C-alpha cells in the first residue's frame, strides 16, 4: 500500500490548521483510494483550541475536549495520541483492536484526572471511522464509533445523513418526544453531554460496522460546526464545493477544501466554539458518487437499519 498522510492536532490561531491526505490501500475487494481534508480553528470567541484530530488511514477521528473542564485540550490530544500509537498509520486493525485502543484512550484521560488530584474531571468527546478488517483479513469494513455529541454523517452527493446519535441531554429529550430537533438547537441544556471519554472508569462507545464498497463519503466534526450550521446549510456547502480535494490551491485567501470551507462558514456564523471538520472520500476501482449515488444510498440505508446502535 502507498500513502501520503499527516496528523493534525490543535491550533491556537483563528486561521486554523489545514491537512490534506491521500492513501491508496489494497483491500480484498479492490484498490481503495482514501482522500481526506481536515481543518480546525479556535473560532471567533475562544482563545484555546481544545479540539484534536487525526486524518490518516486507518483513522479519521475528531476529539473535542470538554469546555470549561480541566485539561480539555490535553484530554483530546491524549485520545488522539493513544489511538495513533496503538493503531498506526498504514495498519488495518480488527474491530477488537479499535475497541482496545478506545479503552486505552479512556484510561489515558483518566490518568490526567488522577495527576490533577481529582479536582476536576478531564474529558473529551470522540467520533470517527476506522478502516478495520475481519475474518482474518478476508473482509474490510468501516468501523464507526462515537462518544459524546461530536458527529459523523454520510454524504452521497445529495443526501446528508447523521450516522451517530448524540449522547446529550437534549437528544434524550428529543428521543422522548419532549422537544423538537429545532428546539434542541437553542435549549439551555444543549451543551450537556451524557457520555465522554475519561468521565468514567469504563467508556461506553456506540460502535458499528459498514461495508467498504464503491464510492463513499463521510463528514466527521465537532459541535462547533453543527451548533453554527444546520444540516441543510452543511449539505448546501458540500454540494456546492464538490469534494475533499482542493479546488484552487493557489487561491491563498480562499478556503482550499470543503473542510476549510465548512470551518470558515461556521466562523462567519458566529464561531462561538472551536470548530473541527474532516471530510473523507473513499473510492474502490475508480467509482464516483455520481456513478453510484442511488445504489449507495439504498444500500447504506438498509445496512444502517440493521446495524445502527440502539438504546
Predicted regions and their residues:
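PP2C/PPM-type serine/threonine phosphatase catalytic domain
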Residues: 1-311
